[in-house]
Amino acid sequence: MESKPKEFKPTWNLQNGKMILPYVLLFAGIILTLSLGSFDAGERGVEYNFFGRLGYYISYGMFFMFGAASFLPGLFTIGLGSLRLVKEEFELTNRLFSIPVFLLCYTVTLQVTGHVSTIPFASQGGFVGQLLSSGLEFVFGSTGKILIHLVFYFYGLILLLNESPLHFIGRILGTAGAKYKEGFKSGFGKRGESLGSLFQSAVEKFQKKESVPPWISTNTNEKNSLNQSYSLSNPHTHSYERNLGNKQPSELQNTLHSTFGKEGKLSDFLSKVDTGPTVTSKNSRIRFQNHGAFSGNFEEQGKVFRFESVSSSLSEKIREEKNFQKTPSRWEILDFRTSSFSNIISEKEPSVTLVVPSESEIKKEWNQTNPILQSEEIPDKFLFEEKEKVEQTDSGLENECYEEESVDSEENLSEEETLSSETSTEKDISENFKTSTISNSKEVSPNHTSNSSIHSLEKSEEKLELGLPFPPTTLVPEVKSKRSIYHVPLKSLKTTTTKIQDPLFKIEADKVARKIEEIIRQYGYESQVVSMERGPIITRYELTPPLGVKLGRITSLSDELRLYLAVKNIRIVAPIPGKSTIGIEVPNSIREDVFLGDILHQNLSLRPKKDLSILIGKDISGKLVGIDLNKLPHLLVAGTTGSGKSVCLNSMISSLVVHLSPEEVRFIMIDPKMVELTLYEDIPHLLMPVITDPKKATRALAWAIQEMEARYHSVSKLKCRDFKTYNEKVEQGAHRDGYKKMPYIVIFIDELADLMMVSGKDLEDAITRITQKSRAVGIHLIMATQRPSVDVITGLIKANCPARMAFHVAQKTDSKIILDQNGAESLLGKGDFLYKSPTAADLIRIQSPYVSEEEIEKIVEEARKFGKPSYVDFNLDEETESSVVDEGDEELFEQAWEIVRTDRKASASYLQRRMRIGYNKAARLMELMEERGYVSPQIGSKGREILK
C-alpha cells in the first residue's frame, strides 16, 4: 500500500525576502511622498493628510529634521524599487546606502542656498541641515564646507552606481583613450596582460606551496557514497543531481590538465570542485579569490560570478524548496444529483424586477423612499455570496474544503436551500410591495425609476415637510460639492523672508529717543524715554511726563516733533491706558511688509474651530490681532481712497474662504463700485451673484431679513439662545427631529455711501433690522465707506455697530464720527488703521495685511474646485411693490389715490394732513404711485404731475 507523501508547509527564506523587497520599497516610497505632499501644518492637518495620523506625524518629523530635502528618500525608494522590478539582477544593497548620503548632502545644499519653504519650520535644510552646515563651516570654513559636501555628493553617486571608488575612477580614465578603452572592457591590466597570463602566474605561485589550504576538505569517497545512497532513497531526485556524477570535464579543466598535469594538488582540487565536491558546512560560506578557475560565467555587470556546478547539499535545499512551493490539493464536494453540469457552465442573463412602493404604504413608512430591485429567477452565480456565508458558519467545512479556480466547483449549496431562500424572499416582497417586471432584453441601471415612483417620492418629501412642527429652518440651499473635504492650500499666498535686524533697530530707536527728549527739553519740559515698542510700521516711545505739567501742553507739540524728526505723521497717546506714561508713535524709516500669508501661517495652530475668527493684522508690538464676528457682531469700516480699506476687506474675505467651507459660512457681496468684490464670482460660498446694482442691494437685504425670521423660529423651537448652541444641538441629535444645521451668513458692503444716496431710507431700515436682531442667528454685516459723514453713518447704524475700523481720514470730524474721538487723521495710510473694540475702551493701532489680486485669484480658483455655487431661489430683478405695501395697506393705497385724483394734489405732506398718517407712510404711498405709473417723478422743487 502506497503511503501518501507528507505535506510540508511553506517556510520563509531569503529568496522570498528578495522577491518582496522591491514591493516594500515602492509601497514605502509612495506613502512617504504622498504624505509629504499632502502635509498641512494647520490644525486640520491630520484630516487633510492622505494617510491620516501616520502620514501627518511622519511628515512633521521629516520636515523638522531635513526640511525641504524630505522628499528625496521617497523619490529614491520609488526609483530603486521600480528598477528592481524591471531588472531582477539589479543590486540594491549599496544603492540603498546612497540615500542617506544624498539626503545629508542635500540638506547642506539647501542651507547654503537659503531655500525658503511655505511650511514655517521646514525652511532650508531643517534641524539636521543647520547642524551639519554650522559644523562644517566651523571646521573647514565656508569654502571648505561647499567642497566637502560636493565630495560626499560624488561618493553617493559612486554608491548609486554600485562600484568601488577606485574601479569607478579607473573606468573613467580608461575611456579617455582608445588604447585603454578596449583593455578595461575585456579584462586587460595595466601592461596589456590578459586574464589567462595573470591566472597562469597565479597558479605557478600556488603550485610552489606544498600544502592545501586548511579550510578546504575534499573526501571524494564519502561524497560518492552519499550521492549514491541519496539517489537510491529518493527516486524523485532532480535529473540535474543524478547526472552530476556523469558530467564531462569542462573545456577549462581539460586545458588546465593538459598544461599542469593530473598529479598536482591543484589539478586534484580542480577536478573535485568541477564535479561538485562536498564542502564542510563549517567553511561553506568562504568565497575563493581564484574564482576564475572554476567553470561558470560572469553576469552582465561583470561583478558577480555564477558557478555552473552546485554542491549536493545546496541542490538538495533547492529541490526541497521547490516541493514546498507546490500548492496543496483542494477538496470540493459536488452533489451531482441536485446540480446539473449544464447549469454550472451556462450563465443565464438575470431578469430584474423593479419594486415600487404604493402611496398608502408611503404614508405609513416614511423611511422607505428608495425602490428595491429583486430578481424573479436567481441564477447560480448570484448565490455565491450566500454560499460563502454558509461556509463561514460551518466550522467543519471551513477546515476541510477549499475553493476551486474553475466555475464548476463553486456550488456548495443544495437545491433545497436555494429554493427555500427564494420562496422566503418572494413572500416578504409580496406582502409589502407591488412589483413590476422589466424584460430581460432591457438594461436597467440602479438609478432608474419610473414616473410613478418619482411622483410618489416627491409627495412623500412634501408630506414630511408638512409634518414638521415649524416651517423650513433655512432658505439657504445646500452646496453640491465635488470633494469630500474642503481645503485651500496656503502655498499660493506670498510670505516675507526679509526681517529688519535688531542691532539696526536699536541704533535707530536710540537716536530717535534722544531727539525726542531734546526737542521737549527745548520747550521747557524735562522728560525721559523709559521704553519703546517696535511694530511693523511704527515705534512707540514711552515718556514719563514732568510733574505739575498738563498733558495738553505736551500733546500740543505734535507738529514740532513732526518737524524736527522729519516724519510724515506723529500720533501722541496721552496717557497710555493702564500706564503712567505718554506714548509718541513715530513711523519707522524702513517699513516692514505684512502679508496675509505670514499671518495665516503663524496662526494655523492657534485658530479655533468652526467660528468666524478673522485675523486683521499686527499691532504696534508685532503681535497678531484677531476678531470674532460672533462677539462683535457687526463691523463698520471707514477710510479715504488709498488708505487700504478695500484691501483690508479682501484680506478678511480671503481669510474666511481659506479657513471655512461653504457648509460653514455663506456670503452676500454688494459692490456698487463693480471692481473690488467681483473677483469672488462663482465661489461656492456665495448665496447670490455679486450685486452691483444699488436697487438690487435693498432686495438682497430684504431676503436676509426673511432668512433671519425663519432662523429665529427654528432656534426658538429648539430652546437655544445663540446660533452656535443651535448647531451643536443639531450635531448631537436634533437633526433626527427635522432640524438642519445652518451656515453663518456674512454680508459684505463695499461702498455704503453710494447705496445710501440711491436707496436712502429703505436701505437704512433694512440695515437697522439686520444689525439689531441677526446676531443670535448667525447673520453678520461688514460695511465699508470712504465718506464717514452723518448722512451715511447714521445714529442707528453707529448704535448697532460698536466694532469699527478707521483708516486714514481727511479731517478730525470724520475721525470723531467713526471713532467718537480724534486720531484717524494722523494715520499713515496703506493699511494703517485704528480699531475700536466693543469690549475695550482704548483704541488699538494695527497694520492690515496685504493680499494681491493674483493671490485672490489663486484662492478663488482653489475654492471653485470644491463645487459650483448654489444660489437662493430669489429673483433680484422683479419689482418689490407687493413687498412695499402688504394686504393691509392696499386699502390705504386706494384711499390715498382717490384723494390725489379728486384734489389734484400729489405730495406726501398733503396725504399726511388729509389721512392723518406719518410722513414715512405718506412718502411710501407716493413712491408706490410713482412705481405704478399714477404720478410722475418729482424733479427738484417742481410738484408731481398726475398721469391718470
From Swiss-Prot:
It comes from Leptospira interrogans serogroup Icterohaemorrhagiae serovar Lai (strain 56601). Belongs to the FtsK/SpoIIIE/SftA family. CDD domains: TrwB_TraG_TraD_VirD4. Keywords: ATP-binding, Cell cycle, Cell division, Cell inner membrane, Cell membrane, Chromosome partition, DNA-binding, Membrane, Nucleotide-binding, Transmembrane, Transmembrane helix. The keyword Manganese does not apply. Residues 159-948 are cytoplasmic. The keyword Coiled coil does not apply. Residues 400-419 have a biased composition (Acidic residues). It is found in: Cell inner membrane. This is DNA translocase FtsK. One of its GO terms (molecular function) is ATP hydrolysis activity. The chain crosses the membrane at residues 19-39, 61-81, 96-116, 138-158. Residues 622-816 form the FtsK domain. One of its GO terms (cellular component) is plasma membrane. Essential cell division protein that coordinates cell division and chromosome segregation. The N-terminus is involved in assembly of the cell-division machinery. The C-terminus functions as a DNA motor that moves dsDNA in an ATP-dependent manner towards the dif recombination site, which is located within the replication terminus region. Required for activation of the Xer recombinase, allowing activation of chromosome unlinking by recombination. It is a multi-pass membrane protein. Residues 432-451 have a biased composition (Polar residues). It holds the Pfam family FtsK_SpoIIIE.
